[in-house]
């Protein structure tokens, strides 16, 4: 079908006159300059090495967005139990561990969690299609704004398609399906991906402050190849120097790709990522000494 000229012209004029809908902010200018949550049918990737805290940060961001903008999300985390995911949401929401919290507070936080999140209990193996079918069934009865799928490589392959397309084209097909699902339902789809083995061998040069330690992933380092970066709207890399004597508690977030800068956000400099300091017991993050969750506009423990 040929695109409608009037619709195209209207969208161009919207850009000209600043009427384009902006991605949602955290109200921290240094972060909002680079990262926005865009809900109007976007496919987003989070990439990074194993054991750097990708899942932890992503769940934290989803919890932050849920509270700040009253949003609802679905989480599919096949390498974590539903209990562990819910626990992280509760601890992030309370700003302290469950050991430090009363049963009354935990109960209130669980109610909040259940109202804003639906967690898919990964007790069976999913393909991309069976997962999307289940998510669509949830969408039909419980309206939500975004979904986290992680990790991508935990999804079983549809071998009929895999045999027809081959590995590289199969990934393109799956990513296209994710993208179309996001557009159809007007939601944000986030997919968490690992890096290739060779990326583990890449380290910072001798003159770098992290000399000899693993480098952050680039788009070409994603397991499955360039299809992922090519197909996604926005891409972030989550990295942490886990063996550094002092900076192990800092999570570095590189914004590698922003497809539509008109809606907010832009890539970070390769040597100036967004650095988030992990709070004690990993119950949240701080940026330049400011707690991202419990700032002046979000009171601690107010449910």
Provide a role label for each language-model segment.
Residues 1-95, 301-303:
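The Walker A/P-loop phosphate-binding site
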Residues 13, 69-165, 173:
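Conserved inter-motif catalytic segment of the P-loop NTP-binding fold
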Residues 75, 148-149, 186-194:
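Structural recognition of the conserved hydrophobic beta-strand(s) that form the central parallel beta-sheet
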Residues 162-178, 188-189, 243, 250, ...:
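A short alpha/beta connector and helix-capping loop motif
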Residues 44-46, 74-76, 118-120, 190, ...:
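Hydrophobic/aromatic beta-strand patches that form the interior of the parallel beta-sheet core
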Residues 78, 194, 240:
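Cofactor-binding loop segments of dinucleotide-utilizing enzymes, especially the Rossmann-like FAD-
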Residues 52-54, 81-85, 127, 154-158, ...:
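Flexible loop/turn segments at secondary-structure boundaries
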Residues 1-11, 16, 129-132, 136-144, ...:
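C-terminal regions of RecA-like/P-loop NTPase motor modules
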């Amino acid at each position: 079908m040929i695109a409608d000229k009037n619709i195209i012209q209207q969208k161009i004029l919207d850009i000209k006159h600043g009427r384009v809908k902006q991605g949602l902010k955290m109200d921290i200018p240094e972060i909002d300059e680079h990262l926005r949550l865009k809900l109007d049918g976007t496919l987003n990737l989070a990439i990074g090495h194993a054991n750097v805290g990708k899942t932890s940060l992503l769940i934290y961001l989803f919890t932050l967005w849920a509270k700040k903008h009253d949003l609802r999300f679905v989480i599919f985390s096949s390498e974590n139990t539903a209990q562990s995911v819910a626990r992280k949401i509760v601890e992030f929401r309370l700003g302290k561990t469950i050991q430090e919290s009363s049963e009354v507070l935990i109960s209130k936080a669980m109610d909040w969690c259940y109202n804003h999140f639906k967690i898919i209990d990964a007790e069976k193996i999913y393909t991309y299609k069976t997962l999307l079918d289940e998510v669509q069934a949830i969408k039909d009865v419980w309206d939500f704004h975004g979904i986290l799928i992680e990790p991508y490589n935990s999804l079983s392959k549809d071998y009929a398609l895999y045999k027809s397309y081959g590995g590289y084209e199969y990934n393109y097909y799956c990513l296209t399906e994710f993208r179309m699902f996001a557009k159809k339902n007007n939601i944000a789809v986030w997919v968490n991906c690992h890096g290739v083995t060779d990326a583990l061998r890449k380290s910072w040069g001798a003159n770098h402050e992290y000399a000899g330690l693993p480098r952050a992933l680039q788009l070409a380092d994603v397991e499955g190849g360039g299809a992922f970066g090519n197909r996604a709207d926005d891409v972030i890399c989550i990295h942490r120097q886990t063996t550094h004597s002092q900076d192990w508690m800092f999570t570095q977030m590189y914004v590698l790709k922003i497809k539509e800068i008109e809606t907010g956000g832009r890539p970070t400099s390769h040597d100036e990522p967004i650095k988030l300091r992990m709070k004690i017991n990993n119950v949240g993050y701080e940026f330049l000494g400011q707690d991202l969750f419990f700032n002046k506009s979000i009171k601690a423990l107010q449910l």
